[in-house]
Protein backbone atom coordinates (compact mmCIF):
# COMPACT_ATOMS: atom_id res chain seq x y z
CA UNK A 1 0.00 0.00 0.00
CA UNK A 2 1.38 3.40 -0.91
CA UNK A 3 0.96 5.99 1.83
CA UNK A 4 1.68 9.70 1.50
CA UNK A 5 3.32 11.06 4.64
CA UNK A 6 2.61 14.73 5.34
CA UNK A 7 3.29 17.02 8.23
CA UNK A 8 0.94 19.90 8.93
CA UNK A 9 2.99 22.21 6.70
CA UNK A 10 4.85 20.16 4.15
CA UNK A 11 4.99 17.01 2.09
CA UNK A 12 7.47 14.51 3.52
CA UNK A 13 7.45 11.40 1.31
CA UNK A 14 5.46 8.56 -0.21
CA UNK A 15 6.12 5.12 1.24
CA UNK A 16 5.13 1.65 0.11
CA UNK A 17 4.45 -0.24 3.34
CA UNK A 18 2.52 -3.24 4.57
CA UNK A 19 0.11 -2.54 7.42
CA UNK A 20 0.41 -2.82 10.31
CA UNK A 21 3.89 -1.26 10.53
CA UNK A 22 5.78 -0.87 13.80
CA UNK A 23 8.37 1.84 14.54
CA UNK A 24 10.17 3.16 17.62
CA UNK A 25 12.44 5.83 19.02
CA UNK A 26 14.00 6.09 22.47
CA UNK A 27 10.70 6.74 24.30
CA UNK A 28 7.99 6.29 21.65
CA UNK A 29 6.59 3.22 19.92
CA UNK A 30 4.21 3.46 16.97
CA UNK A 31 1.74 1.06 15.36
CA UNK A 32 0.72 2.38 11.95
CA UNK A 33 -2.62 0.80 11.10
CA UNK A 34 -4.17 3.04 8.43
CA UNK A 35 -3.24 5.55 5.75
CA UNK A 36 -3.33 8.45 8.19
CA UNK A 37 -3.40 7.22 11.81
CA UNK A 38 -1.15 5.40 14.24
CA UNK A 39 -1.18 4.49 17.90
CA UNK A 40 1.64 6.14 19.82
CA UNK A 41 2.91 4.61 23.06
CA UNK A 42 5.08 6.83 25.25
CA UNK A 43 7.16 5.02 27.84
CA UNK A 44 9.14 6.56 30.69
CA UNK A 45 8.27 9.25 33.24
CA UNK A 46 4.94 10.22 31.65
CA UNK A 47 3.55 7.05 30.06
CA UNK A 48 0.67 7.49 27.63
CA UNK A 49 -1.13 5.79 24.76
CA UNK A 50 -2.71 7.99 22.11
CA UNK A 51 -3.93 8.19 18.54
CA UNK A 52 -1.91 10.46 16.26
CA UNK A 53 -1.16 11.18 12.58
CA UNK A 54 1.36 8.82 10.97
CA UNK A 55 3.74 11.69 10.28
CA UNK A 56 4.74 11.37 13.98
CA UNK A 57 6.21 7.94 13.21
CA UNK A 58 8.40 9.36 10.42
CA UNK A 59 9.37 12.89 11.49
CA UNK A 60 12.89 12.26 12.86
CA UNK A 61 15.98 10.34 11.79
CA UNK A 62 16.27 8.42 15.05
CA UNK A 63 12.93 6.63 14.56
CA UNK A 64 13.33 3.20 13.01
CA UNK A 65 11.39 -0.01 12.39
CA UNK A 66 10.81 -2.45 15.23
CA UNK A 67 9.08 -5.79 15.67
CA UNK A 68 5.46 -6.32 16.61
CA UNK A 69 6.69 -8.11 19.76
CA UNK A 70 8.72 -5.04 20.83
CA UNK A 71 5.71 -2.77 20.24
CA UNK A 72 3.30 -5.08 22.09
CA UNK A 73 5.64 -5.38 25.09
CA UNK A 74 5.88 -1.58 25.33
CA UNK A 75 2.09 -1.24 24.86
CA UNK A 76 1.23 -3.75 27.60
CA UNK A 77 3.83 -2.42 30.06
CA UNK A 78 2.60 1.15 29.51
CA UNK A 79 -1.05 0.16 29.84
CA UNK A 80 -0.29 -1.69 33.09
CA UNK A 81 1.59 1.35 34.44
CA UNK A 82 -1.28 3.70 33.55
CA UNK A 83 -3.90 1.41 35.12
CA UNK A 84 -1.79 0.87 38.26
CA UNK A 85 -1.39 4.65 38.67
CA UNK A 86 -5.15 5.20 38.30
CA UNK A 87 -5.85 2.42 40.82
CA UNK A 88 -3.55 4.11 43.37
CA UNK A 89 -5.57 7.35 43.20
Which residues does each PLM region occupy?
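Structural boundary micro-motifs
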Residues: 1-89
